[in-house]
Amino acid sequence: MNPDVLRNYLSKYRTNRRDTLRMAGAAGAVVVASSAGVQPASAETGNGSPAGTDSGGDFDDKPFDYADPANLADWAPSRYGAGDQRGAFNEVTAAKTAAALSVLKPGKPVRTYNLGELMWNGFPAFKTDPRRIHEQRLTIAGYQPPPGFLEAGGVLMTTEPLGANKLSYHEERFAAELSPLHPVPLASTFQIATQTDNLGHIGAGEYYYNGFRGPDFAAAHGVTKLGNEHMGPIATRGVLLDILGMKLAEGKTGDLAEPASNGKPLLRENYRITVEDIKAAMKFGGIGRISPGDVVLFRTGWNQLLARRDAGDILRWEAPNGMPGIYLREARWLAQFRPAVIGSDTWALEVLGNPVNDNGSAFPVHQELLMRNGIRIGESYVLDGPADDRVYEFVFAVTPQFSEGATAGNTPPLALGQPRRH
């Protein structure tokens, strides 16, 4: 890309000069690297076809017929066995983890990337009732709190320190709220901010992954099948598909939206990431193949709408006009490789507000991946660090909350990667 194209796009929206120059320079560096031929970082990325082990099948957007979810013929029992609760996490074997670690070359600096959003009180979330909320409160013990602390919602346990050594301490609690649908105040959830959706999260009617039926495993405390106790931890190969970076480098500003209030670019609100985009992003990042047990992550720039906690940005983040992402054809194309997780920096992974959404289906990609394929979904992963350093292949690790019966984990994943020189 001619960096002037990016400068013109950013100046149109009055982005500050420092960001304009930095991003234009980065785009130019990526183009230079791409034109020179980016070498894969490991044996797993080989110089083969971008499709890797592509079956060559004909993948389409035809919705699965959920008129009779009890017809399990093509998706249950799972390829991993009739009683399986781990899904594609089964692909993350000891050998897979060892191969993933070989991505890191001896003697080269390794950077640790936090892929999680910073949570704050009032963090936005998909609207449900009862609401998904995050309202943290500090508790104090051992001294008199400052003026206004209690009035603002802080909690004083005692002003008296403990013991002869006058021990004082801080802890956190989480505020709860009443809902018209439930008589007991409810507090936070793992289904907020950066999260990894588990297989017990989404189904069709009574039916969930591997044919498990909701009435058979729903309990007051959580699910008795497909809960977080069957999920992690995992350490495996991660692959970044930088759709935003690729569009910037190619000068395709028509696929971009108005920048966030911090001046950072993002994909157009209802932009559908196609299979062709995926293959092009693999080539852009020097990724030769997607392998079983990989974690595949899409960067769209959507997380920049949370950077300043700006009301207008947050409204856009909630996606009243749509959100970029994949749809069924892309989900099915990726599922053939049996990745452990497919995720993005948006809160849904799948495209919203696009004409393909006009068929009346609600979050069909979630059903396709979680229920039919046992592939977990990552949401609101922060991918700017690896993208800025042109780290398209890395070691991915996450340990979701080890919470019995939970439907997701919102512990931030990490990536270990070796930055490329610009």
Which role fits each region the language model picked out?
Residues 48-422:
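Active-/binding-site microenvironments in catalytic and ligand-binding cores
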Residues 23, 44-46, 77:
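Small disulfide-bonded, cysteine-rich extracellular recognition modules and tandem repeats
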Residues 14-19, 30-48:
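N-terminal twin-arginine translocation
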Residues 1-19, 26, 42:
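N-terminal secretory signal peptides
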Residues 28-31, 35, 206, 346:
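A generic secondary-structure signal for well-formed alpha-helical elements
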